[in-house]
Amino acid sequence: MADVRKLKNYIDGEWVESKTDKYEDVINPATGEVLCQVPISTRAELDQAAVIAEQAFEKWSQVAVPRRARVLFGFQQLLIQHKEELARLITLENGKNLSEARGEVQRGIENVEFAAGAPTLMMGDSLASIATDVEAANYRYPVGVVGGIAPFNFPMMVPCWMFPMAIALGNSFILKPSERTPLLMEKLVELFSEAGLPKGVFNVVYGAHDVVNGILENEIIKAVSFVGSKPVGEYVYKTGSANLKRVQALTGAKNHTIVLNDADLEDTVTNVISAAFGSAGERCMACAVVTVEEGIADEFLEALRTAAQNVKIGNGLDDGVFLGPVIREENQKRTIAYIEKGIEEGAKLTVDGRETGLSEGHFVGPTILEDVTTDMTIWKDEIFAPVLSVIRVKNLQEAVRVANQSEFANGACIFTNNAKAIRYFREKIDAGMLGVNLGVPAPMAFFPFSGWKSSFYGTLHANGKDSVDFYTHKKVVTARYSLKGYEE
């Protein structure tokens, strides 16, 4: 293991060796190869980064907004130039196929593009006359030092929800990437620095509990953005809020897809396969449950099973591979346990992904469990793997009632050509992001990622205008200017 590279933290524009004696292996989930080791940094290192970020904020927040935007535009151009390299890094440490990784890089670039619109986004508003000789104006100011806690499943897209917008609006930032996928962040830091970002404005501290707690407790840090599981998200929200921080926590999901009798069969099957099994099901917008009307159920499920059985599984760097590995061996074992729990509770296993025939890596094949009911563990829990539950329903109303029983409410989709059904779905479903005749309704950067219920803790979501509000304070100035002496 002596030749395995140990990653360093990025503080004050320099790569700094961690003071910790604890390191974790970063593993290629498709092969088991150790790619590098990541430090489990100390609380003191996080606190040091906070001091540096606070000092950098004092200068960066005073930089003219158009100049800050130019740095973001430069960063965006460098990301485009290095798109293929970034995609390969994602596949190497995360496992998703190269096509999906390229798509993730593109979404990250789009988030940087949106953030580069800071001169417009920072604009306030005003009213010239609120009373005699009195006017009022509303100004935006950055909140200060911001902390971000990012997950493994989208190592580029999710951090790019966070730090580009926060920094473009004048804040400084400390990011804790996932310890499972840290390599990509090295490259992003390099490119952001090359684009002209001053030292100390963006800092990266790898770690686990101590670093998370530092972000939540350090008084210098004024706001925290989190994406991850529900239990951790609840902890982040409660702890950060108790320490008087502004917090947004995007958490778990159990997304339902409704298939009505008039759905286009081929198109629906293609979309459901991609939504359920793409990225190995490790995404908070994955299709986890299909509720299908009885009239189309037999034909739809036969086609769905056939398509699932024909999915190519393997290393995401190999040509033609659709489904890569889950992130770790423990995730693989956990997924298999869920499948077996579903069988034990009465679900019918019609496509079995427990055995893939691959000798290396942490793979689970496409899995379909039918005759699922809402009292089953596999319906209730977020499995975060390529496992799809199927429920037959009599009509749209029943499908909506089933979906609305879930504690999660991130996304939901419907496949139909009936305008009335679409309107009913839109009005009655409890979810923040809806798809009509598409499988993954993740919004573009200029719309909020708007989960409901246990899928989100906070008030202001990531992305869109919400993110501008999250990363800025508002200051309303009311002024009296008498025109006495200027009478005509």
Swiss-Prot record:
Protein name (Swiss-Prot/TrEMBL): Malonate-semialdehyde dehydrogenase
- Its domain of life reads Bacteria
EC primary class: oxidoreductase
Say what the protein does: Catalyzes the oxidation of malonate semialdehyde (MSA) and methylmalonate semialdehyde (MMSA) into acetyl-CoA and propanoyl-CoA, respectively. Is involved in a myo-inositol catabolic pathway. Bicarbonate, and not CO2, is the end-product of the enzymatic reaction.
Q: Which BP terms does GO give this entry?
A: inositol catabolic process; thymine catabolic process; valine catabolic process
Q: What CDD domains does the record tag this protein with?
A: ALDH_F6_MMSDH
What's the catalysed reaction?
A: 3-oxopropanoate + NAD(+) + CoA + H2O = hydrogencarbonate + acetyl-CoA + NADH + H(+); 2-methyl-3-oxopropanoate + NAD(+) + CoA + H2O = propanoyl-CoA + hydrogencarbonate + NADH + H(+)
Which Pfam families does the entry link to? Aldedh
Enumerate the transmembrane spans: none
The catalytic activity of this protein is classed by the Enzyme Commission as: 1.2.1.27
Name the UniProt key words of this record, in alphabetical order. NAD, Oxidoreductase
> In what pathway does it function?
Polyol metabolism; myo-inositol degradation into acetyl-CoA; acetyl-CoA from myo-inositol: step 7/7
Say if the entry is tagged with keyword rRNA-binding: no
Gene (UniProt)? iolA
Which PANTHER family does its entry note?
Answer: MALONATE-SEMIALDEHYDE DEHYDROGENASE
The UniProt similarity line reads:
Belongs to the aldehyde dehydrogenase family. IolA subfamily.
Gene3D superfamilies in the record: Aldehyde Dehydrogenase, Chain A, domain 1, Aldehyde Dehydrogenase, Chain A, domain 2
**Active site (catalytic residues):** 284 (nucleophile)
Which residues does the annotation say bind NAD(+)? 150, 152, 176, 179-180, 229, 251, 382
Species per Swiss-Prot/TrEMBL record: Listeria monocytogenes serovar 1/2a (strain ATCC BAA-679 / EGD-e)
Q: How does it assemble?
A: Homotetramer.
Give the molecular function GO annotations.
Answer: malonate-semialdehyde dehydrogenase (acetylating) activity; methylmalonate-semialdehyde dehydrogenase (acylating, NAD) activity
